[in-house]
Each structure stands twice: as C-alpha cells, then as structure tokens.
Amino acid sequence: MKARILFFITLSLLLVRCKDSESLIPDPVVFDASAFVEVEDLQGNPIAGVKIKVGDYQGFTDDDGVLFLKEIEMNPATYLTAEKTGYFHGSRRFYPSAGRISTVKLVLMTEQLVGTIQPGTGGTVQVGDGIVLDFPANAIVDEDGQAFSGAVSVYAQPIMADDPDLYYKMPGDLVGAREDDTRTGMASFGMVAVELRSGSGEVLQIKGGSTVEMKMEIPSSLIASAPSTVPMWYFDEESGWWKEEGEATLVGNEYVANLPHFSYWNCDAPFETVKWGATFVYEDGSTASQVEVC
C-alpha cells in the first residue's frame, strides 16, 4: 500500500457501499457467500490456529495462516472475528456479495507488555514512540468492580495514523456509531489497543468515575488537517462497530483525551459516506480480482 493513509482510509470507506439509511443495523438479508481469510503477525508471518468466527460458523487457520469459508451464511455487512491467545482481538467488517468470494486480510498484534504500575500511586506508561498513558492513583478495579491493590501489567499496541498496515491491524472497519446512533465514516488520526491484567492474568479495568489521560502524537504529514477537537471512539467487540465516547483536544502535535475504560480506542474525525462501486479490468477486458485500492 503506497498511497497516503488518509486517501486509503477515504477509499476504504467508499468501498463499503453504504445504504442510504444512516442506521448501523444491517439489512435483514442473508445469503450464501465465500471468503478467503488470511492472518499474519506484525512481521508478516502466517499465524496458524487462529479461531475465525462468522455468525454461527467457526474454523481455524492452517499452517499458512489461511482459512477458506465456503458458501456460509453471510449478510451485506458481515462481521468476522479472529482470536488467538497472546494476541489482541482481531476482526473485520466486510461487505460480501451472494455467490462471490471475498478476500479478508488481518494482521494480529501481540499483547505487548509495555509497563507495570502500582494502583496506589498510578504512573505513566509509554506505548511505542507516539502514545503516553497517565494513570491516576487508586483508579484500578478487578472484574467485580473492587479496588485492586497488586501490580498492574499494561499490555498495549499503537496503530499510528501513517501506518501502512493500519487497515489490516484495526478491528471492524472505519464506520462508527455517533452518540445519537447514526452512522458515520471515520478518518483516523491514530489508535491504541490496551489491556490491564493482574499477575495471575485477571483482566482489570478503570474504576467508574476515573479516567486515564492519553496523549497521542500526530504524524507531521497530518498536522495541517488535524481539527482542534475530534471525537474519540472505542471498539465494541460484541456488535463489531466503533462507538463515539468523549473527545480529544489538539495540544501542539498531540491529541489529548481522557479514557474511562480500555479496549481499542480510535481518534477520528467523522465524515459522511457515499455509495460507490467499481469494476476493475485488465487491458484485454477480462475482470481483475483481489485488486488492492490505494
């Protein structure tokens, strides 16, 4: 992928072939279709044994990181998930056609330990080169909502806005639900995946009423187009859509936001989608398949 990331994102939004309705609920239409699913790690190596789920169907990738979904039930906005221990949640919302074969590529990110904090004092954690998380004191709870006092392991991965693999790493697609439940396209200025765990592996969260400050550096190529404020979005793994919650403020070359819970977070400017489609052909007039649009 060689084009600038914003251009790629815009085209990926156009390719979703949005309906005139602004609802996020797909049409109640089902049909049989097929999909070729390919899963890689951050180094481009195939990942075997990834559990792929589409509706009631599930299967596992082979040694080449591949699974072929043959003539299974899909809908016009099919949600596919990819899970394997040691990796962050992976998923894609794609737009198949009856009787056709779709191609879905995913890059799963390892759950990278980026730091350890003590809940009583809080602390600052660096995620990659461009994201900082600042935890306040006494802000971590266990799965039952009780205050947690042990060491907290912070696992995280950044997805910077100029990452050429952004679309393959991110979950879902770049369509989200606004606070009024209407649908919108999204142009990303960066994302981050974060999980908190105890020493025994218990999933932890931020205490209700508390927030973690996030500072996300914006690539220099995007500073000129960065709004003074943009909505923040978290990814709802159950529904498969990004959902608006809060906003980020531009301070220098960073967006600053306060996050009330953890999952994937996305710093995105909303924009209207349009209905768009195209057929690609070779010089001899034959139809081209699996064309990457950049």
Model-derived segments and their meaning:
Residues K51-F68:
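Short, acidic Ser/Thr/Gly-rich low-complexity loop/linker segments typical of extracellular
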